[in-house]
Amino acid sequence: ELLKEKRQALITHAVTKGLDTNVPMRDSKSEWIGEVPEHWRVCSLGYLSRISTGGTPDRKNDSYWNGEIPWVKTGEINYKIISDTEERITDAGLSNSATFIAEPGTILMAMYGMGVTRGRVAVLGIPASFNQACAAISCSSGVHNWYVFYCLCAAYRFIRDLGNEASQVNLNLEIVSKIKVPVPPLLEQEEIEKHLVAQLQKLDAIEQRVSNSISLIKERRSAFITAAVTGQIDLRESA
């Protein structure tokens, strides 16, 4: 949990405050962003990108399923690069539903989900179709998709809560398009991306070491218990 909090704090600080601690700041007038460098813009996601939803081919029509076209569900959106999918559809399924093929680099956001799913994002590593619970975000030339991806990672809790207002349980295109994003100049976006890639790789390495240590402890504990209950170890106190 501490590593997750560290990761979230690292991303949030980089995409809202930048890497230069000496620049003057101003109020962004956005709840999740707070203050931003004075020379940055703050724009709605809908202004910076084209946002679309997908669809689901008729489940009752077997000719629409088990084809060659990857089809993404919200459960597969989990802050990763999507390189494969659990299900695939056919050309007929694509033609006879609201989905379409989004290009690699497109950001997908999960709009539905009562658990932790709603508000999560991922980046397509392959051309893929997707269901109506996903929003496909194709960035304009003024922003880098990976920078926007990190912004949406940072805004996860804020975005998730947008789906809780009044009786609105899920997100929709209107809500997603109004999300505010801090926009530094392109060069700074590149610098922030490089910085985050390097720092997150370090955190990943630490997380892997911790996971390996926990696994080793569990193995040794299991081996000790087995040895104790089978009489291989004398647990009686020595006289």
Where are these regions (language model features)?
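A generic structural signal for residues embedded in beta-strands
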Residues: 109-110
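Short, Lys/Arg- and Gly-enriched loop/turn segments at beta-strand edges
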Residues: 116-123
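A short glycine-rich beta-alpha junction/loop motif
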Residues: 27, 127-135, 165-190
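Short beta-strand/loop turn elements enriched in aromatics
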Residues: 9, 62-80
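Sequence-specific dsDNA recognition surfaces
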Residues: 28-29, 46-60, 75-104, 130
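Short amphipathic coiled-coil heptad-repeat segments
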Residues: 1-38, 209-239
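Non-catalytic DNA-recognition/assembly elements of restriction-modification systems
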Residues: 28-55, 178-186, 190, 198-201, ...
